[in-house]
Amino acid sequence: MSERKEGRGKGKGKKKDRGSRGKPGPAEGDPSPALPPRLKEMKSQESAAGSKLVLRCETSSEYSSLRFKWFKNGNELNRKNKPENIKIQKKPGKSELRINKASLADSGEYMCKVISKLGNDSASANITIVESNEFITGMPASTETAYVSSESPIRISVSTEGANTSSSTSTSTTGTSHLIKCAEKEKTFCVNGGECFTVKDLSNPSRYLCKCPNEFTGDRCQNYVMASFYMTSRRKRQETEKPLERKLDHSLVKESKAEELYQKRVLTITGICIALLVVGIMCVVAYCKTKKQRQKLHDRLRQSLRSERSNLVNIANGPHHPNPPPENVQLVNQYVSKNVISSEHIVEREVETSFSTSHYTSTAHHSTTVTQTPSHSWSNGHTESVISESNSVIMMSSVENSRHSSPAGGPRGRLHGLGGPRDNSFLRHARETPDSYRDSPHSERYVSAMTTPARMSPVDFHTPSSPKSPPSEMSPPVSSMTVSMPSVAVSPFVEEERPLLLVTPPRLREKKYDHHPQQLNSFHHNPAHQSTSLPPSPLRIVEDEEYETTQEYESVQEPVKKVTNSRRAKRTKPNGHIANRLEMDSNTSSVSSNSESETEDERVGEDTPFLGIQNPLAASLEVAPAFRLAESRTNPAGRFSTQEELQARLSSVIANQDPIAV
């Protein structure tokens, strides 16, 4: 029994075998339960440092009262000398050895031994612990022990394998071997950071093995290998691939941002273009509208200018009738010049006979058309005999009141009665008119009024007077104002058939009446008047005649002229007709009779709507038996002076003919 204990304590299997050798052999084949227990084979393990290892020791059959013991490199592992990371667990029929966080010191030979009443058995295994990322020596061949005895050989093969191992050693010995770290003195065997191990074998001397790093190889790790280059290249590839991926991602992000920015730019540019287009269209529309408005304004201005010009032309010329019918006579408004001729010029040149052309008002300018007989001669057969018999005829203009509306009076054309030169000095003042002078009523070719050549019409002839006029040019009393009427040949030109009628301005007429007491010389005794006088224009007596007018004219005051026989003839046109009234008064030449006649004529002028032809001597020239009562409204005169008999004969001839339609 002492030998068995020693054998257990030493852990040697030979003694066990020796002790069991004395038993009879037939016991092996006996199936009785008296046979000793048998352990299953344990496998050797190789593991990296820090890993967990488990060694199991099992019996092939179940036995009761079994005891297990573990040994490391021949030393029993108990509670005293057992490392902290090794634990032993006992279970029924088996035992386990657990190594937690294995290290290089845990490598070695481990043996399990079972003890029972029937017998003992043991099994062993090698454990190799290497550092991480290193290929360490392995034990690919397992050590087989079957009924281990001192006579049976045990073969252990140790080899180092790996891709970068510096050496591989295999030994075949009779006994067991294991790797142990070299001592401090022996560590210098391996160079370049190699790890030194010693292989201990019972029969052979120890040998050194080197565990080399990746960059070196050889028995002593003396050879340099570019192993780290591959690792670094991989790392570099990874490092380069990552930035590439990042760059790709960044480029994709940039592209997306660029696309968004491009789209935004396109949208902004499109919006700007649309806005500019809209603004341009608005500008074009506004320009067109303003242009149209300007054109309208220009057209209106032109129209107004044209209307003003036409008004001025109508004022100056009246309506144009280039070829008037022979039966119509056109009375045109008197031309008003912008440059008003001074009263002095008018007074100095008013010694000639003036023929009134139109009736002037202060508000309107209109023309009146009168009928004309188809005769183209100044006198027919009857009138020629009368004119030849008459030495002097007193005729006065009946449209002196037309000068009342114009303050200064327009310039007048002159026609020399004896074929002398015409005085056209006043044309200087009419050049600033809108139209040329040849279209004005003062021109020679334009006639403001026409009288029928076949019929003689008495016209008032009066001589204007002014303070500057010499006494020889002073107009005498009306009774002595006679002018010789030489026969005038008919001109082949229509323009010359229309003599220009001159009108005495109202202011000068008033002056003439003021200076009437001073005018004592007779007209036929004044040689200046006879040399410069006009041939008398036959103005017909307007009696009970119809006229046409566009609008009613304002009333014009008509002064009354004194006659030597103290007869005042008042001719009015109430309700568009001309009514002649002849009032016979006593012979008086006082100023009171003048004023009364002027006031009465002013009342009559207010009632006159249109051209009032006032001939104070016409009443004295008319004879009651010669008048046709159906065509005249004149009152017959009671008595006639001897000087008026000739004029009465003339008026009787004129009255027999058709009246002028005013």
UniProtKB/Swiss-Prot annotation:
Q: Which GO terms describe its biological process?
A: activation of protein kinase B activity; brain development; cardiac conduction system development; cardiac muscle cell apoptotic process; cardiac muscle cell differentiation; cardiac muscle cell myoblast differentiation; cardiac muscle tissue development; cell differentiation
Which residues does the annotation flag as glycosylated? 120, 126, 164
Transmembrane regions listed in the UniProt entry: 266-288
Q: Does the keyword Transmembrane apply?
A: yes
Give start and end of each EGF-like domain: 178-222
Bias kind Polar residues: ranges: 374-383
Q: Name one GO cellular component term.
A: cytoplasm
PTM comment: the record says: Proteolytic cleavage close to the plasma membrane on the external face leads to the release of the soluble growth factor form.
What residue ranges lie in the Cytoplasmic compartment?
289-662
Question: Does the keyword field hold Calcium?
Answer: no
> Which ranges are annotated Low complexity under compositional bias?
358-373, 585-596
**Subunit annotation:** The cytoplasmic domain interacts with the LIM domain region of LIMK1. Forms a ternary complex with ERBB3 and ITGAV:ITGB3 or ITGA6:ITGB4. Interacts with NRDC and BACE1.
Q: What is this protein called?
A: Pro-neuregulin-1, membrane-bound isoform
**Top-down, what is the taxonomic lineage of the species of origin?**
Eukaryota, Metazoa, Chordata, Craniata, Vertebrata
